[in-house]
Amino acid sequence: MVQQTNNAENTEALLAGESSDSGAGLELGIASSPTPGSTASTGGKADDPSWCKTPSGHIKRPMNAFMVWSQIERRKIMEQSPDMHNAEISKRLGKRWKLLKDSDKIPFIQEAERLRLKHMADYPDYKYRPRKKVKSGNAGAGSAATAKPGEKGDKVAGSSGHAGSSHAGGGAGGSSKPAPKKSCGPKVAGSSVGKPHAKLVPAGGSKAAASFSPEQAALLPLGEPTAVYKVRTPSAATPAASSSPSSALATPAKHPADKKVKRVYLFGSLGASASPVGGLGASADPSDPLGLYEDGGPGCSPDGRSLSGRSSAASSPAASRSPADHRGYASLRAASPAPSSAPSHASSSLSSSSSSSSGSSSSDDEFEDDLLDLNPSSNFESMSLGSFSSSSALDRDLDFNFEPGSGSHFEFPDYCTPEVSEMISGDWLESSISNLVFTY
């Protein structure tokens, strides 16, 4: 190894000396080695017509000026340092050819022109046809052609076996790289599609999100969550009130300005509670996605049936005069009487919490209201409020559906006492609500 490096250094020194001496060195090199036109070695081989024909009959191209010069110089380097690798010799020859002056290249250019004319005379029908490699180049060319359809097979075959394998590897790499991108595309899409629905259902948790059908999920608004509590103008509120009867589970009057459009508050005398009160969902348009939140109120199911009455089968006009009526906020407000065109089936669902037991509180109504409002799913349709024999069973079922952390942001468990309920349902709230609703 040391001897090889020493030989390389000696060769470099020799070549550097030749290039530094410019003309003299070149003349010395030319004098020491046979001239391009001499017949000693290169000239004789070039003059022989069979020098460019291989044993298989393939005709080689005529040499250019660099090939003529490099053939002479390569033989010199190989004689001086036989252990030097052929690639290293070619690298050094290329650098030296670039450093040669044009005047020094003239004799080799003339020799190359002479060889070209001789080649034309010897082979008049010659046409450059690169030979396709049969052994290893075929597989490389096939794989490269599949990876790069625009690449010609001649170009691949012209390269060496190593280059062909590198081309094939590059083609395979190019074809395999888009595959992970394509595979990760559905993941990104699925995550971006799936996440908004998970974020849009804060109250139901994973159970409510899983119970949504695609049609009901399509009805969910994709905008900001504040669009649920959209404030209506008086002109927009008038047709909404005239097209559907006014009845809903009224929530406690926290944030009344935010919720005044979503629900119509029913305050008034006890005797008026026996009048028919229909659900808003009876005539609400199920195809309107915002109707679920604005017109439909808490009791609007996707098929338009009313879920507003807590227990329509167990409610009675006599029970509506019990003190539980104040806790349910279900008496009619004198300022907004229900229209006479209420549906007949809605008259059976009187005051929302009329027959509730004394243990039930206003927070149950609030929980039920927000749960139905944020989860218009088929589970609540099957859990239709008229199918329960008593409101206590409904309370138990609603309490069972609520889990910690899955309720809406309107939960106030501290205000569950009857005293607070009576305070909230007092007469002072009626005037403030009516002012908020009708005074803009």
Curated annotation (Swiss-Prot):
Q: Name one GO molecular function term.
A: DNA-binding transcription factor activity
Q: Where is the composition biased (Polar residues)?
A: 1-10
Q: Where is the composition biased (Acidic residues)?
A: 363-372
Query: Which PROSITE patterns does the record cross-reference, listed alphabetically?
Result: HMG_BOX_2
**Observed phenotype of the null mutant:** In T-cell-specific knockout mice, loss of mature Il17a-producing Vgamma2-positive gamma-delta T-cells and reduction of Rorc expression in immature Vgamma2-positive thymocytes. In a mouse model for psoriasis, dermal inflammation induced by skin application of TLR7 synthetic ligand imiquimod is substantially reduced due to the absence of Vgamma2-positive gamma-delta T-cells.
Where in or outside the cell it occurs: the entry states: Nucleus
What segment(s) does the record annotate as region Disordered? 1-58, 128-211, 234-258, 272-382
User: PTM N6-acetyllysine: at which residues?
Assistant: 95
* Main localization category: nucleus
UniProt xrefs under Pfam families: HMG_box
Q: Which Gene3D superfamilies match?
A: High mobility group box domain
Motif 9aaTAD: where in chain: 392-400
CDD domains documented for this protein: HMG-box_SoxC
Point out the DNA-binding stretch(es): 59-127
Q: In which tissues is it expressed?
A: Expressed in both gamma-delta T-cells and Cd4+ Cd8+ double-positive (DP) alpha-beta T-cells. Expressed in the ovaries and the thymus.
- What's one GO-annotated cellular component? nucleus
- Bias (Low complexity) occurs at 31-44, 136-148, 157-166, 234-253, 304-322, 330-362, 373-382
Q: What does this protein do?
A: Transcriptional activator that binds with high affinity to the T-cell enhancer motif 5'-AACAAAG-3' motif. Required for IL17A-producing Vgamma2-positive gamma-delta T-cell maturation and development, via binding to regulator loci of RORC to modulate expression. Involved in skeletal myoblast differentiation by promoting gene expression of CALD1.
Q: How does it assemble?
A: Interacts with UBE2I. Interacts with HDAC1; interaction inhibits the transcriptional activator activity.
Q: Any other noteworthy remark?
A: May be involved in the T-cell immune response in the psoriasis-like disease which is induced in mice by the application of the TLR7 ligand Imiquimod to skin.
Q: Which PANTHER family match?
A: SOX TRANSCRIPTION FACTOR, TRANSCRIPTION FACTOR SOX-4
Q: What is known of its domains?
A: The 9aaTAD motif is a transactivation domain present in a large number of yeast and animal transcription factors.
Full protein name: Transcription factor SOX-4
Give the species this sequence originates from.
Mus musculus
